[in-house]
């Protein structure tokens, strides 16, 4: 692991994964990827982590698939104790590296915090998380404090054209055709 900030610290940081538990005694770690294809996390370099409030560049020496897991070897991390210090560190890259999307495609990070409003004008709340279900993505919407239906959270499918009627990232607003009682 390099302590120098030679690679430029991300201007627009985005978390692409997390370092998991150690694997073996030679400094290998499990990696949990948030990318659609798990191995795609290795396409985005350089990696950074934050420790003690400071950015640190993480240089990969090697990676491989082991059973269902991805495991990595970080340069300069040669034993289990050193690897343990990296457990639970989020893997961060500069979001400028991410590819441009086609129309009606969105990065989840851009949807976070958007206000979700029905076509009738009812404010359902704000997007606090997204989930992948296999068939479609689902917005986790935290309801407003004075929700007329007593909801705390809603799960709203992200189905463009069916449920999603309009997405305005500039205004941080997603319009949906959805019954507020659900």
From Swiss-Prot:
Residues 103-182 form the PRC barrel domain. An accessory protein needed during the final step in the assembly of 30S ribosomal subunit, possibly for assembly of the head region. Essential for efficient processing of 16S rRNA. May be needed both before and after RbfA during the maturation of 16S rRNA. It has affinity for free ribosomal 30S subunits but not for 70S ribosomes. The keyword Transport does not apply. The keyword DNA-binding does not apply. One of its GO terms (molecular function) is ribosome binding. Belongs to the RimM family. InterPro entries: PRC_barrel-like_sf, PRC_RimM, RimM, RimM_N, RimM_N_sf, Transl_B-barrel_sf. The PRC barrel domain binds ribosomal protein uS19. Keywords: Chaperone, Cytoplasm, Ribosome biogenesis, rRNA processing. This is Ribosome maturation factor RimM. It comes from the Bacteria. Binds ribosomal protein uS19. Its main location: cytoplasm. One of its GO terms (biological process) is rRNA processing. It is found in: Cytoplasm. One of its GO terms (cellular component) is ribosome.
């Amino acid at each position: 692991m390099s302590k120098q900030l030679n690679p430029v610290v991300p201007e627009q940081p985005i978390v692409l994964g997390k370092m998991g538990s150690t694997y073996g005694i030679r400094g290998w770690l499990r990696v949990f990827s948030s990318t659609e294809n798990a191995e795609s996390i290795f396409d985005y370099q350089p990696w950074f982590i934050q420790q003690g409030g400071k950015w640190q560049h993480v240089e990969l020496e090697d990676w491989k698939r082991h059973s269902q897991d991805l495991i990595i070897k970080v340069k300069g991390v040669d034993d289990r104790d050193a690897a343990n210090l990296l457990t639970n560190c989020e893997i961060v890259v500069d979001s400028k590296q991410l590819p441009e999307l086609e129309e009606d495609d969105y990065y989840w990070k851009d949807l976070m915090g958007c206000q979700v409003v029905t076509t009738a004008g009812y404010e359902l709340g704000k997007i606090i998380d997204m989930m992948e279900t296999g068939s479609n993505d689902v917005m986790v919407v935290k309801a407003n404090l004075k929700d007329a239906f007593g909801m705390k959270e809603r799960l709203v499918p992200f189905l463009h054209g069916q449920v999603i009627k309009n997405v305005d990232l500039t205004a941080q607003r997603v319009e949906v055709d959805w019954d507020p009682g659900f």
